C-alpha cells in the first residue's frame, strides 16, 4: 500500500471504446492487488476489476476539457480508458500503477496473498493433481529402450531441466555429461514424448556449440543412442525450428547446428519459426489493427496480413505436423531444438504431441501437456510474460501462440477436443494474472527454492473443480476424431487459419454476440437431454397403457363365451360381446406377452374404474399414446362400433370385455 498515492478518485469516467459518447460515471479505487472501477448507477451496479499483474502498458494522454485521459492496456487484451477530472489525481494514479504493475520481487505478486479459503490439505491435493511420473507411466516408460535417469539430481548437470529425465538406456552418465557440455545452456537431448505404437520418440535439446567445425564424440553418441532406442528406424530426424539464416549466423558465435558429416544416420530439417523479437513486434502490429475504430474490411485484412501473425502461427503448426507425421507414419524418432530449447522447441513438441495423442486433447491431458513441455522443462515464464520488472526485450507471446495453435486445431476438428474455447482463454488469462503459482519463475529449480507449492495454490485444481464450464458439447469419446492421430489436410487450401476474435476482441462488447457459440451449444445440449428424459417418461406411460390393454384382452378371452351357470342374461347384462379388432389402433406398439402374474388372475375393470383409477391413463390415452378410447356403452344394450380394421382378421383378434 505504500506505493499507492491516491487510493480513491471520484467522478471518474469509464469510456466505452465502441461508443465513446457512452461513458459510465463512477469511482476509481486502487488496492494492493487490483484497480477497481465502480459505477455510480445502482441498478445494476457494475464493477470492473483489473489485476495489477495484468497491466501491460499505461499511457497518460493530453489533458482535455473533460479531464485527463488514462489509457490502460492489459496482457489479456483488455483496454481501459479512464477520464480523471483532475490532472494531479491522474498523475498520482499513473505513478502508482507504474510501480504496482512492475513488482521487483516475487513476494509482491498476487498469488502470495491470494487465499481461496482452502486448508493446507486441499492446497497440497491441488498440486498433486497433475503427476508427471504417472504421465510417463501412461506412455509405457520405463521400458527396454528408455530409462529414468538421476544424472540431473540436485540440478547438477542442467539447472533449467527437471531432476527426473528419461534418456536412452544405452546413454551412460559419461555420455550425458559430455553431451551437455556441447549444448547451449547444457540442455542435452532428453525424451519429451514416447509413441509406444512403434517405439518412435520426440526428444528435445538446445543447439550444439559446433561453430564451423567443432564436434563432440559424446554428443554424437547421444544421438546414436536415441536412434538405437527405436528399432523400427535406421535414422533420426533433427529438426531445427529456426530459419536457416539465423542458424548460420549463430555459427559465427560458436553455436549453430549439427553437421551431417559428423552425425551418422541423421536427416536434418529447418522449419523457419522466427525469434521472440519478431513475434513480439508481430503481435503489437496485430493489436494495433484490433484497436482501430470502425475499420473497413480491406483495412482490417490488410493490417492483419501486414502483421504476419497468422503466418507465424502457420509456421509453428507446420513444424508440429511434420514431426507428427515423421513419428506416426515414418516411424522415425525426432530431435527438436531451437537456440536454447525453451521457446520454439516447447511450441513444436507440444503441438506434435497434441496431434499424436488423444489424451492431450482432454481436459486433464492438456494440463499434463503444459506441465510437461512448458513448466517442467524450463520455459522462462518470468522473462517472457513480465511477471517482475525486467528487460522488456525478453517479453514475447510464446505460449500465447501455442494456445492459438490449439484453437486453430479445435476449429478444424470440433469434435476432437474435450475442452472448449473458454478453457484456453482462462489458461491464457492466468498465465499473466499471477493469481496461482504454476507459471512463476523460469525453472523448476527456482520454484522449489521459493517453495511455490507450500505458499501458493495450483491453477489446475481450480480448473478441474470448475470443469463443467470448460466442456465441449460437441466432444464424443467414440468419435473418429477422438481416436489416434489427427491428420490434417495435405493441401493448404483445406486448412484455413482464422483470426481469433474470441481472444483478441473478447472485451469489445459491440463485436461479440451476447451468447457465445459454446454457451449456445451447451443450452441446446441441455434442452436435448431434457427432451430425451421427457420422451423416456412418456414411453414408460405408454408401457403402462399397453399393459392395461393386454390385461383387458386377457379378461375378454376368458369371458368371451356365455356363462352356463350364471343367472343373468348375457344379452341384457353384457356390455359387449362382439369381437373387435384393435390392431389398427395398436399397430404402433410392439407385441408383448402378459406377465405370469397376469396369467394367474383375471383383471375386471369397470368403466368408471378405467376412467378414474389413473387419471393420466384415462385423460391422455388418446392424445399421447394414440390408443383408442376403450370405454363401452351402457349396459342397456348396444355394442361397440367395429373399428376400421375389424373386418381384416376377426378370428385372430380377441374382444375387450368390460363388465359394468
UniProtKB/Swiss-Prot annotation:
Biased composition (Basic and acidic residues): 641-653
Enzyme class: hydrolase
Biased composition annotated in UniProt, kind: Polar residues: 566-596
Reactions this protein catalyses: a 1,2-diacyl-sn-glycero-3-phospho-(1D-myo-inositol-3-phosphate) + H2O = a 1,2-diacyl-sn-glycero-3-phospho-(1D-myo-inositol) + phosphate; 1D-myo-inositol 1,3-bisphosphate + H2O = 1D-myo-inositol 1-phosphate + phosphate
Gene3D superfamilies for the chain: Pleckstrin-homology domain (PH domain)/Phosphotyrosine-binding domain (PTB) (2.30.29.30)
Active site: 338
Positions in coiled-coil regions: 521-551
Main location: cytoplasm
Known tissue expression: Expressed specifically in brain.
Binding site for a 1,2-diacyl-sn-glycero-3-phospho-(1D-myo-inositol-3-phosphate): 250, 275-276, 339-344, 384
Its membrane topology: Peripheral membrane protein
PTM annotation (Phosphothreonine): residues: 578
Means of activity regulation: Interaction with MTMR9 increases phosphatase activity.
Record localization: Cytoplasm; Endomembrane system
GO biological process, one term: protein dephosphorylation
UniProt cross-references to PROSITE patterns, sorted A to Z: PPASE_MYOTUBULARIN, TYR_PHOSPHATASE_1, TYR_PHOSPHATASE_2
Record key words, sorted: Coiled coil, Cytoplasm, Hydrolase, Lipid metabolism, Membrane, Phosphoprotein
Location of region: Disordered: 554-660
Domain Myotubularin phosphatase: 126-504
GO CC terms in record: cytoplasm; cytosol; endomembrane system; membrane
Enzyme Commission numbers on file: 3.1.3.64
UniProt family annotation: Belongs to the protein-tyrosine phosphatase family. Non-receptor class myotubularin subfamily.
Assembly mode: Heterodimer (via C-terminus) with MTMR9 (via coiled coil domain); the interaction enhances MTMR7 catalytic activity. Does not homodimerize. Interacts with RAB1B (in GDP-bound form).
Protein name: Phosphatidylinositol-3-phosphate phosphatase MTMR7
Organism: Homo sapiens (Human)
Gene coding for it: MTMR7
Amino acid at each position: 500500500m505504500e506505493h499507492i498515492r491516491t487510493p480513491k478518485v471520484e467522478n471518474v469516467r469509464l469510456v466505452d471504446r465502441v461508443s465513446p459518447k457512452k461513458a459510465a460515471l463512477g469511482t476509481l479505487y486502487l488496492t494492493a492487488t487490483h484497480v477497481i472501477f465502480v459505477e455510480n448507477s445502482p441498478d445494476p451496479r457494475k464493477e470492473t476489476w483489473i489485476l495489477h499483474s495484468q497491466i501491460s502498458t499505461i499511457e497518460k494522454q493530453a489533458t482535455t476539457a473533460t479531464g485527463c485521459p488514462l489509457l490502460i492496456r492489459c496482457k489479456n487484451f483488455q483496454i481501459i480508458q479512464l477520464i480523471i477530472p483532475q490532472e494531479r489525481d491522474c498523475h498520482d494514479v499513473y505513478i502508482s500503477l507504474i510501480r504496482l504493475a512492475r513488482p521487483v520481487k516475487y513476494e509482491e505478486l498476487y498469488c502470495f496473498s491470494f487465499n481461496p479459503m482452502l486448508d493446507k490439505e486441499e492446497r497440497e491435493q491441488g498440486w498433486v493433481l497433475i503427476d508427471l511420473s504417472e504421465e510417463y507411466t501412461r506412455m509405457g516408460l520405463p521400458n527396454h529402450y528408455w530409462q529414468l535417469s538421476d544424472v540431473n539430481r540436485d540440478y547438477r548437470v542442467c539447472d533449467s531441466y527437471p531432476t527426473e529425465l528419461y534418456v536412452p538406456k544405452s546413454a551412460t552418465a559419461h555420455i550425458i555429461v559430455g553431451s551437455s557440455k556441447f549444448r547451449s545452456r547444457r540442455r542435452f537431448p532428453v525424451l519429451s514424448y514416447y509413441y509406444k505404437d512403434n517405439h518412435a520418440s520426440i526428444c528435445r535439446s538446445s543447439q550444439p556449440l559446433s561453430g564451423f567445425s567443432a564436434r563432440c564424440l559424446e554428443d554424437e553418441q547421444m544421438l546414436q543412442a536415441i536412434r538405437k532406442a527405436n528399432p523400427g528406424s535406421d535414422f533420426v530426424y533433427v529438426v531445427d525450428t529456426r530459419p536457416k539464416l539465423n542458424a548460420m549466423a549463430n555459427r559465427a558465435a560458436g553455436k549453430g547446428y549439427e553437421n551431417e558429416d559428423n552425425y551418422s544416420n541423421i536427416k536434418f530439417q529447418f522449419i523457419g519459426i522466427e525469434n521472440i523479437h519478431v513475434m513480439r513486434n508481430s503481435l503489437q502490429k496485430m493489436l494495433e489493427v484490433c484497436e482501430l475504430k470502425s475499420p473497413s474490411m480491406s483495412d482490417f485484412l490488410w493490417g492483419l496480413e501486414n502483421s504476419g501473425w497468422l503466418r507465424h502461427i502457420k509456421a509453428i503448426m507446420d513444424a508440429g505436423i511434420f514431426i507428427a507425421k515423421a513419428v506416426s507414419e515414418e516411424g522415425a524418432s525426432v530431435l527438436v531444438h531451437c537456440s536454447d530449447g525453451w521457446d520454439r522447441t516447447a511450441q513444436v513438441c507440444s503441438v506434435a504431441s497434441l496431434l499424436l495423442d488423444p489424451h492431450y486433447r482432454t481436459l486433464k491431458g492438456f494440463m499434463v501437456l503444459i506441465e510437461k513441455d512448458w513448466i517442467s522443462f524450463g520455459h522462462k515464464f518470468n522473462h517472457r510474460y513480465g511477471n517482475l520488472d525486467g528487460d522488456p526485450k525478453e517479453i514475447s507471446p510464446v505460449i500465447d501462440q501455442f494456445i492459438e495453435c490449439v484453437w486453430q486445431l479445435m476449429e478444424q476438428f470440433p469434435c476432437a477436443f474435450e475442452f472448449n474455447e473458454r478453457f484456453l482463454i482462462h489458461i491464457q488469462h492466468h498465465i499473466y494474472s499471477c493469481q496461482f503459482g504454476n507459471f512463476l519463475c523460469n525453472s523448476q529449480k527456482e520454484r522449489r527454492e521459493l517453495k511455490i507449492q507450500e505458499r501458493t495454490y495450483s491453477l489446475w485444481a481450480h480448473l478441474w473443480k470448475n470443469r463443467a464450464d470448460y466442456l465441449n458439447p460437441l466432444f464424443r469419446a467414440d468419435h473418429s476424431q477422438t481416436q489416434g492421430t489427427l491428420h490434417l489436410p495435405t493441401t493448404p487450401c483445406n486448412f484455413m487459419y482464422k483470426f481469433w476474435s474470441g481472444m483478441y476482441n473478447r472485451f469489445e462488447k459491440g463485436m461479440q454476440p451476447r451468447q457465445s457459440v459454446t454457451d449456445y451449444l451447451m443450452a441446446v445440449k441441455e434442452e436435448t437431454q431434457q427432451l430425451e428424459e421427457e420422451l423416456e417418461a412418456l414411453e414408460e406411460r405408454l408401457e403402462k397403457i399397453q399393459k392395461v390393454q393386454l390385461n383387458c384382452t386377457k379378461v375378454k378371452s376368458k369371458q368371451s363365451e356365455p356363462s352356463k351357470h350364471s343367472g343373468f342374461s348375457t344379452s341384457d347384462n353384457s356390455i359387449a360381446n362382439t369381437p373387435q379388432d384393435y390392431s389398427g389402433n395398436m399397430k404402433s406398439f410392439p407385441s408383448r406377452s402378459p406377465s405370469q402374474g397376469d396369467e394367474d388372475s383375471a383383471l375386471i375393470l369397470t368403466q368408471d374404474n378405467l376412467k378414474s383409477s389413473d387419471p393420466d391413463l384415462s385423460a391422455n390415452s388418446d392424445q399421447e399414446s394414440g390408443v383408442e378410447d376403450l370405454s363401452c356403452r351402457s349396459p342397456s344394450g348396444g355394442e361397440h362400433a367395429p373399428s376400421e380394421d375389424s373386418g381384416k382378421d376377426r378370428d385372430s383378434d380377441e374382444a375387450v370385455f368390460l363388465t359394468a
